[in-house]
Amino acid sequence: MKNSGKLVSFLVPIISILLAFVIGCIIMAVLGANPFVALESLWIGAFGSLRNVGTTLARSTPLIFTSLCACFAYRCGVFNLGGEGQFLMGSIVCCYIATQSGIEGLPAILLCLVGGAVAGGVWSLIAGLLKVYRGQNEMIITIMLNYVATLFMGVVYTNWLRDGSVPQTQAVPDATQLSRLFGLRVTSAFAIALVVGLLVYYFLFYTSKGFQLRAVGLNMTAAEFNGFSVKKYILMSFIVSGAIAGLGGSAELLGTQFRLINGFGNGYGFDGVAMALIGQLHPLATILVAIFFAALRVGSTTMQAATGVPTSVSDIIQALVIVFTVAGLAMVKLPGFKAFLGRLTERRKEAA
């Protein structure tokens, strides 16, 4: 019964992706395009050459950070919807250090990354403290903090660190920018994201603290009864998840954008939440989901150029994947579905 449930949960995202592509192909056919040619051009645009692969991995990097942020928090049973705000606060502190400290090179890079992580963690901790000590709903608080961070970033690039007459900040010095990998668009920020993902995976599944954090997420009352400090782990989850998002903001600034401007980091936070859910809160799975979504976004441009299918079709496919996955996982947890799986398992045992 338990193994059958795990298998079904594993298959839900895969089936959701297939269904989303089937509907996407129907839409392409209605628009007068050949779905197979369109899908081929989508694949070529995302993975058809080393250059395209580099672009896909570069686009996936911020998504990996924000999805890991959501994954870590949700494992502790708290809903951190403030990944975007924490991402922005990390990038703001990183931008200030990179452009105003006078330090360049590797020391500046390390200082920027650490500063961004600290900023994201502190920004997230605000919601954690309000939840633990005042009983406030963390979802509402983190969403509100997203707006505050966005407005604060606007002040930064229009006034505080503005570069001349253009509403944008000064650019990160060349010596402080992250290096490209193999001459492609993807930078060492992607490598940092992978390392963070592996560290999160190791911590959650191979350390006693990670086990206790997951136990708190499964049942806070039972965890507290067994002597676990629930408040401590809730605060830890907010700090670490915020630090991951803040580190992502720093890496995005140093590796891809190089300056703050209107629209920087827009949507990354909620995209990360969706990808964490599709990856079923598994750190390594969320990395693959982030790369998949980035591939859809990068490949859609080539698909439009080759077949005339608008890039919005790719957006529809992404939305359908999210809807089908969430609906499927919710259905799997229904008592009736669990009972059906139990009867099916018993029949298989009897047949054997």
Predicted regions and their residues:
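Cytosolic-side transmembrane-helix boundaries in multi-pass membrane proteins
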Residues: 1-17, 218, 225-232, 300-352
